[in-house]
């Protein structure tokens, strides 16, 4: 039986040596509503901007985000962009950057101008020198790469054709890795797959595959046939062709193709999705999974990546939500462990335009009255967060004999309900701090309160939100249930 937790534990033990073209990705978001009076060119009214580690650096970030360690070897120029990337990579606890500085070229930088409303790219500006690294830089790159091979469980070459992965660097790295029994995954850019000879797996997209094989690659059968010829030339074990919304096809040498459909998702930005696929394939294969399991994980990760704006990474929690059935996520994914985790989930929901609701309570012994309030609350919003009093908070409010169930047990019961999307445990006597942080669009309590008695009502009202009071079911309360149980025992 598939165990996601066991997979994550195995991933955490892996080290990936990632080599490739590092770049800075900048995204400038805005809208165009007029043409410049100076020239027939659109004027972009800038609303915000984001800066991310891109190219092979994004592969390294995804390796680290999913829980593995990454030794990253890349090239930077002697400029502010290079120093910024070096600092950013150095701040990642799971990434060990080994960067070579080439003062003869700029650090690659790409600036994309994107419609905030439609998430469409309007323009891209590049600062780069794409020529192969000079012989002395090649040697410095190899001096950085080869000593790290023994420490790695798997090697990943991320080729953006920006000068790092020259024919010599590719050849010497693959040959040295094979001598040590290390598998090598290549995300190729060159149409000459023969330069990657001896790699374990090549992961071209359909356009790259078509250019390299000169095949139409219009059907899975055509891809499989062309892949067998390409693998014979490249002497690799398998080829994975990514096909955007049509999923991906893996062709093992001499074996039957494996097709995995794309997961349904609203696509916001495809930038860096190939990086995510390569990273997840590497760490999952290094962990001992087979081709099918690695493809399944990579497909799920790609679905998460394209649903985000900009160059994005995928976390274990996001991957879990895509891979596992919804019902199995309750205790593990619905219970928030930190404010940062809560903020990230809120950011994602608001990016999707979802209406967030909030209710709270001790929920010591869940009864039909609770279920009615929770169901009504979920019906008034798109995502419901339940604030749960901690054990210490319950004791202060209800007395030393309470709670009957400890906070983790209460949280797991709530998380198992379909109406509940998140459970946040709070230590204070009231959920005011949580409400202030969340700023819900809907605040829900039982009808035994008045609007003015509902903690946080003024915060919600100030933001244009609603306060909803749900009629309580008579005869149902935790206090009365506990009292009746004790009377029965005596």
Swiss-Prot record:
Domain of life of the native organism: Bacteria
Active site: residue positions: 275
SUPFAM superfamilies: Nucleotidylyl transferase, Ribokinase-like
Enzyme class: transferase
Keyword entries, A-Z: ATP-binding, Carbohydrate metabolism, Kinase, Multifunctional enzyme, Nucleotide-binding, Nucleotidyltransferase, Transferase
Pathway: Nucleotide-sugar biosynthesis; ADP-L-glycero-beta-D-manno-heptose biosynthesis; ADP-L-glycero-beta-D-manno-heptose from D-glycero-beta-D-manno-heptose 7-phosphate: step 1/4; Nucleotide-sugar biosynthesis; ADP-L-glycero-beta-D-manno-heptose biosynthesis; ADP-L-glycero-beta-D-manno-heptose from D-glycero-beta-D-manno-heptose 7-phosphate: step 3/4
GO MF terms, alphabetically ordered: ATP binding; heptose 7-phosphate kinase activity; heptose-1-phosphate adenylyltransferase activity; phosphotransferase activity, alcohol group as acceptor
Alphabetical list of InterPro entries matching this protein: Bifunc_HldE, Carboh/pur_kinase_PfkB_CS, Cyt_trans-like, PfkB_dom, RfaE_dom_I, RfaE_dom_II, Ribokinase-like, Rossmann-like_a/b/a_fold
CDD domains (alphabetical): RfaE_like (cd01172)
Catalysed reactions listed for this entry: D-glycero-beta-D-manno-heptose 7-phosphate + ATP = D-glycero-beta-D-manno-heptose 1,7-bisphosphate + ADP + H(+); D-glycero-beta-D-manno-heptose 1-phosphate + ATP + H(+) = ADP-D-glycero-beta-D-manno-heptose + diphosphate
A GO biological-process term: ADP-L-glycero-beta-D-manno-heptose biosynthetic process
Family designation: In the N-terminal section; belongs to the carbohydrate kinase PfkB family.
Functional summary from the UniProt entry: Catalyzes the ADP transfer from ATP to D-glycero-beta-D-manno-heptose 1-phosphate, yielding ADP-D-glycero-beta-D-manno-heptose.
Subunit description: Homodimer.
Protein name per its UniProtKB record: Bifunctional protein HldE
């Amino acid at each position: 039986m598939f165990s996601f937790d066991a997979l994550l534990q195995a991933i955490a033990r892996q080290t990936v040596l990632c080599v490739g073209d590092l770049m800075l990705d900048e995204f400038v978001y805005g809208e165009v509503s007029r043409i410049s009076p100076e020239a027939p060119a659109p004027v972009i009214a800038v609303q915000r901007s984001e800066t991310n580690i891109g190219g092979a650096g994004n592969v390294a970030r995804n390796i680290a985000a999913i829980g593995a360690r990454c030794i990253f070897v890349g090239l930077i120029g002697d400029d502010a962009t290079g120093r910024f990337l070096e600092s950013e990579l150095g701040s990642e606890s799971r990434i060990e950057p080994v960067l070579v500085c080439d003062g003869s070229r700029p650090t690659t930088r790409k600036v994309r101008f994107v419609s905030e409303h439609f998430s469409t790219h309007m323009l891209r500006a590049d600062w780069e020198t794409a020529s192969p690294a000079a012989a002395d830089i090649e040697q410095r790159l190899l001096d950085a790469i080869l000593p790290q091979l023994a420490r790695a469980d798997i090697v990943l070459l991320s080729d953006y054709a920006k000068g790092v992965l020259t024919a010599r660097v590719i050849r010497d790295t693959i040959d040295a890795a094979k001598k040590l029994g290390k598998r090598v995954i290549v995300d190729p850019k060159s149409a000459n797959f023969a330069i990657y000879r001896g790699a374990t797996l090549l992961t071209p997209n359909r356009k790259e595959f078509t250019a390299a094989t000169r095949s139409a690659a219009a059907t899975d059968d055509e891809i499989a046939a062309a892949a067998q010829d390409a693998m014979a030339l490249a002497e690799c074990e398998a080829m994975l062709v990514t096909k955007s919304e049509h999923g991906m096809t893996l062709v093992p040498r001499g074996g039957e193709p494996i097709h995995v459909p794309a997961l349904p998702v609203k696509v916001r930005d495809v930038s860096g999705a190939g990086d995510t696929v390569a990273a997840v394939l590497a760490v999952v294969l290094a962990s001992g999974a087979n081709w099918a399991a690695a493809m399944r994980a990579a497909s799920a990760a790609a679905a998460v990546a394209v649903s985000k704006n900009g160059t994005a990474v995928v976390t274990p929690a996001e991957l879990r939500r895509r891979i596992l059935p919804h019902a199995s996520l309750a205790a593990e994914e619905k219970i928030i462990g930190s404010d940062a985790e809560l903020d990230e989930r809120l950011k994602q929901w608001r990016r999707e335009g979802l209406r967030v609701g909030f209710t709270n309570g001790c929920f010591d012994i869940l009864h039909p009255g609770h279920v009615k309030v929770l169901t009504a609350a979920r019906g008034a919003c798109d995502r419901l967060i339940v604030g749960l009093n901690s054990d210490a908070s319950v004791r202060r409010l209800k007395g030393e004999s309470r709670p009957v169930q400890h906070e983790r047990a209460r949280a797991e019961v709530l998380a198992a309900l379909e109406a509940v999307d998140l459970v946040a445990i709070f230590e204070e006597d009231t959920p005011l701090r949580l409400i202030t942080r969340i700023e819900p669009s809907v605040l829900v309590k039982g009808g035994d309160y008045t609007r003015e008695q509902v903690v946080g009502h003024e915060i919600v009202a100030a933001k244009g939100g609603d306060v909803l009071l749900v009629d309580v079911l008579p005869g149902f309360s935790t206090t009365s249930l506990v009292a009746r149980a004790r009377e029965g025992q005596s």
